[in-house]
């Protein structure tokens, strides 16, 4: 098991790797406008990974019911969920449609998460990265080992 210091170094390496991909498209003082929301989204993605299949199955059963939000939260065992078939890893399977698929993924989060994401004003950055051809490679960084932001990584912040 990696030490706390090694985990911190790994996450710092992730941020620098993403910053390298943003060079030429964004100014250094703008990197955080991309890295912070993506890191939050990836963290949500990792947290939901254990119950993803259960949520998708439950969604098929309850998508037309008025109480679906409550039932999907129960299925995810969290106060939020995502009903997209995509995860960060699954998004990598279709690089030609990355912008469309990533937007669909984001739109399938529960309303409380979508509200958080809207406050980042991130939508324009998706367009910019897609138009500049870096959206796929930036998202791909989050699927590497250093991009794993699952539960055990929360200890680096303690």
Protein language model regions, located:
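Non-catalytic, mostly N-terminal accessory regions of nucleic-acid modification and defense proteins
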Residues: 1-158
């Amino acid at each position: 098991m990696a030490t706390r210091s090694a985990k911190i170094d790994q996450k710092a390496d992730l941020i620098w790797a993403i910053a390298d991909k943003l060079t030429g498209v964004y100014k250094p003082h703008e990197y955080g406008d991309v890295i912070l929301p993506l890191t939050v989204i990836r963290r949500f993605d990792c947290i939901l990974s254990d119950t993803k299949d259960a949520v998708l199955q439950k969604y098929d059963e309850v998508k037309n019911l008025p109480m679906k939000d409550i039932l999907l939260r129960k299925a995810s065992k969290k106060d939020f969920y995502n009903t997209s078939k995509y995860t960060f890893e699954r998004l990598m399977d279709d690089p030609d449609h990355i912008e469309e698929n990533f937007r669909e993924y984001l739109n399938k989060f529960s309303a409380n998460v979508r509200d958080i994401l809207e406050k980042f004003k991130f939508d324009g950055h998706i367009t910019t990265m897609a138009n500049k051809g870096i959206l796929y490679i930036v998202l791909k960084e989050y699927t590497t080992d250093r991009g794993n932001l699952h539960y055990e990584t929360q200890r680096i912040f303690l």
